Amino acid sequence: MLSPKRTKYRKYHRGRMRGAKTRGNEICFGNFGLQALEPTWITSRQIEAARRTITRYTKRGAKLWIRIFPDKTVTARAAESRMGSGKGAVDYWVAVVKPGTIIFEIGSVPEEIAKTALNLAAYKLPIKTKFIIKDNIS
């Protein structure tokens, strides 16, 4: 699973996801991409499940770029613990995804294979997504 090697702080506030993404919303590396249409947190397990789906479907013939990284911690309290006594322990890592964010990019495969692979990966994610194509494919 993806997680940072070290962070400035162990625990973070939840924050709010307002507005659309202004950076990271265009295809930079591959020819095809999967773009988020809703704001959400995507866990490192969900990213890994989608990555495995893409690599299995393309039979490792595609070049894959993961454009999001889970750099925020989510904490959880132990079951049946009393209120108070501080914030819970770190449970898992999430990537904050806003509408317009490119989640995955894929290259070196035909459009039909890329579209099917990214649609299969989209089933593993908790949001609505759309398949996009780079403008200047030569």
Swiss-Prot record:
Superkingdom classification of source: Eukaryota
InterPro entries, per database record: Ribosomal_uL16, Ribosomal_uL16_bact-type, Ribosomal_uL16_CS, Ribosomal_uL16_dom, Ribosomal_uL16_sf
Record keyword Cytoplasm present: no
Molecular function terms, GO-annotated: rRNA binding; structural constituent of ribosome
Keyword entries, A-Z: Chloroplast, Plastid, Ribonucleoprotein, Ribosomal protein
Cited CDD domains: Ribosomal_L16_L10e
Signal sequence, renumbered to the chain: none
Gene Ontology biological-process annotations: mitochondrial translation
Entry keyword annotation includes DNA repair: no
Subcellular location: Plastid, Chloroplast
Gene Ontology cellular component list: chloroplast; mitochondrial large ribosomal subunit
Pfam family, one: Ribosomal_L16
Family to which this protein belongs: Belongs to the universal ribosomal protein uL16 family.
NCBIfam families assigned to the protein according to its UniProt record, in alphabetical order: rplP_bact (TIGR01164)
Subunit (UniProt): Part of the 50S ribosomal subunit.
Protein name: Large ribosomal subunit protein uL16c
Native source organism of the sequence: Phaeodactylum tricornutum (strain CCAP 1055/1)
